[in-house]
Amino acid sequence: MHTLGMHVRRIREAAGITLEELARRSGLSFRGVVYIEHGKRNPSLTTLLNLARGLDIEPSRLLEVFDAARREPIESPKSDPE
C-alpha cells in the first residue's frame, strides 16, 4: 500500500531535504514529521498544506495521495474456517 508518509519521504529525499529541514520549513516538530513519514500519525489538512510548503510543491501532490488512501477499503480480518 502506498501511504502518504511514504510519498512525503520520497519527495523529501528526492529534493535533498533532511527531516530537520522539512520540520523547520513546514513549522512542524521533528518528531511530527517522523511520525507522518512512518505512518504513525494522520496529518490534518493544515499539516498537509504546511508539508507541501516545506517541500516546495503544490499541495495537490499530497492531497491526491491523501484522498486515494482515504477511499481505500478497510480490510476486515479473515476468520479461520473451522
Question: What does each model-identified segment do?
Answer:
Residues 8, 22-23, 33-36, 62:
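Conserved hydrophobic/aromatic packing and binding residues within compact polymer-binding modules
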Residues 6-25, 50, 77:
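Short basic helix-loop element that most often maps to the first helix and adjoining turn
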Residues 27, 46-61:
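DNA major-groove recognition helix of helix-turn-helix/homeodomain DNA-binding modules
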Residues 27-41:
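Recognition helix of helix-turn-helix/homeodomain-like DNA-binding domains
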Residues 63-82:
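Short, charged recognition helix plus adjacent turn
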Residues 10, 14, 54-57, 68:
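Conserved amphipathic alpha-helical interaction elements at protein-protein interfaces in regulatory
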Residues 35, 39, 50, 68:
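Alpha-helical DNA-recognition elements
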